[in-house]
């Protein structure tokens, strides 16, 4: 019975992830019967797009798997990263909106601990930990980790505070005494740094769980010509709050969603880098019991329903499903996902005012 329970919990956590470092360590945690503490940190930096739903759904999975989960509202991190013009009031307002989005997206927020980075930064012991982490990380390693901010290593030349950011992220994990660190693949370097430094400090190594990054609606561009590392490439091709046409936002209207998906990069028979298929896989089919209905005229094959992503991908790669039919089906299903979230945010006058103030200040 215990083994079955561990497998069920592991499978729930592992689904729709890119990697777990390491799977054996995670299974060991689940089998131990001990309290497991996990977290994700995010920058409250603007209006959430649907790519954020990927990690929000994974938070739900972890909570339902019995993990004691915290969400770090990385306000000071956002300030260092020049988000929202460095206006801490706007940054905190953005955090309040994200909480509402999580709740409307079905995350059991009553079982999640929300932590403002101010809580950490106000403790002198936290800064002592940052210094100890810095003593055990080379400057070159820290510079390479700047991609976790959506920045390139050379951008540290402009503002030295950028170098503190990776050290803070590693220290967050140690300060909160975490067993699991969740993040997108763009956070991998910080998590690997944390695992390396943990050994040097005699601390437990966090299990790193990495979720996929939803590609820009505009496609990969010159990704195939890039000589950068995977983190750099991901930063270039993912949905971005500062580039509205690359993303669907959780407050977009039905018509905007249809328009954006209709224009999205979606080459026939191609899976890699296809944002429409990624939305289907990581957002739509991530929900239990979801069925994608494709309505099309009889002369093009007639209506068809897909109860699994694997069925959808097979028909698409075989050419039995046209890109336009895929787009139309995904758009209509995505509208159903976004509609209650949009209503929860825009239906609250205070949230709506905060959103309007934030929208004009979104920065790279």
From Swiss-Prot:
Reactions it catalyzes: tRNA(Tyr) + L-tyrosine + ATP = L-tyrosyl-tRNA(Tyr) + AMP + diphosphate + H(+)
Disulfide bonds: none
Class of the enzyme per the UniProt entry, highest EC level: ligase
One GO-annotated biological process of the protein: tyrosyl-tRNA aminoacylation
UniProt keyword terms in alphabetical order: Aminoacyl-tRNA synthetase, ATP-binding, Cytoplasm, Ligase, Nucleotide-binding, Protein biosynthesis
Domain of life: Archaea
Listed EC numbers: 6.1.1.1
Protein residues bound to L-tyrosine: 39, 165, 169, 172, 187
Protein localization: Cytoplasm
Molecular-function GO term, any one: ATP binding
Protein residues bound to ATP: 49, 52, 241
Motif interval(s): 'KMSKS' region: 238-242
Pfam families linked: tRNA-synt_1b
InterPro entries: aa-tRNA-synth_Ic, Rossmann-like_a/b/a_fold, Tyr-tRNA-ligase, Tyr-tRNA-ligase_4, Tyr-tRNA-ligase_arc/euk-type, Tyr-tRNA_synthase
GO cellular component: cytoplasm
PANTHER family: TYROSINE--TRNA LIGASE, CYTOPLASMIC (PTHR46264:SF4), TYROSINE-TRNA LIGASE (PTHR46264)
Subunit-level organization: Homodimer.
Family membership: Belongs to the class-I aminoacyl-tRNA synthetase family. TyrS type 4 subfamily.
Entry function: Catalyzes the attachment of tyrosine to tRNA(Tyr) in a two-step reaction: tyrosine is first activated by ATP to form Tyr-AMP and then transferred to the acceptor end of tRNA(Tyr).
Protein name: Tyrosine--tRNA ligase
Upper classification of the organism: Archaea, Thermoproteota, Thermoprotei, Desulfurococcales, Desulfurococcaceae
Gene that this sequence comes from: tyrS
């Amino acid at each position: 019975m215990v083994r079955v329970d561990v497998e069920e919990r592991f499978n729930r956590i592992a689904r729709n992830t890119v990697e777990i470092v390491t799977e054996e360590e995670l299974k060991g945690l689940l089998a131990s019967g001990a309290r497991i503490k996990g977290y994700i940190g995010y920058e409250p930096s603007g209006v959430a797009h649907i790519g954020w739903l990927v990690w929000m759904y994974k938070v739900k999975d972890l909570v339902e798997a019995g993990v004691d989960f915290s969400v770090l509202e990385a306000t000071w991190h956002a300030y260092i990263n020049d988000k929202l013009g460095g206006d801490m009031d706007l940054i905190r307002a953005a955090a309040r909106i994200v909480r509402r989005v999580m709740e409307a997206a079905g995350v059991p927020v009553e079982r999640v601990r929300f932590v403002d980075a101010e809580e950490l930064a106000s403790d002198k012991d936290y800064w002592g930990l940052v210094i100890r982490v810095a003593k055990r990380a080379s400057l070159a390693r820290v510079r390479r980790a700047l991609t976790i901010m959506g920045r390139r290593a050379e951008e540290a030349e402009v503002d030295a505070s950028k170098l503190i950011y990776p050290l803070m992220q590693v220290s967050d994990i140690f300060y909160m005494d975490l067993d699991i660190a969740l993040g997108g693949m763009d956070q991998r370097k910080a998590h690997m740094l944390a695992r390396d430094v943990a050994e040097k400090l005699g601390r437990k190594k966090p299990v790193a769980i990495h979720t996929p990054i939803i590609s820009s609606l505009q496609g990969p561009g010159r990704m195939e010509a890039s000589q950068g590392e995977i983190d750099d490439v991901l930063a270039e091709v993912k949905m971005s709050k500062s580039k509205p046409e690359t993303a669907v936002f959780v407050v977009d209207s039905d018509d905007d969603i249809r328009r954006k998906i209709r224009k999205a990069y979606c080459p026939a028979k191609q899976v890699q880098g296809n944002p429409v298929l990624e939305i289907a896989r990581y957002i739509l089919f991530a929900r239990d019991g979801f069925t994608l209905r494709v309505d099309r005229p009889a002369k093009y094959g007639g209506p068809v329903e897909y109860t699994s992503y694997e069925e959808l991908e097979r028909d698409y790669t075989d050419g039995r499903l046209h890109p336009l039919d895929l787009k139309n089906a995904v758009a209509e299903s995505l509208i159903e996902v976004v509609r209650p979230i949009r209503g929860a945010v825009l239906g609250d006058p205070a949230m709506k005012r905060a959103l309007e103030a934030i929208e004009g200040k979104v920065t790279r």
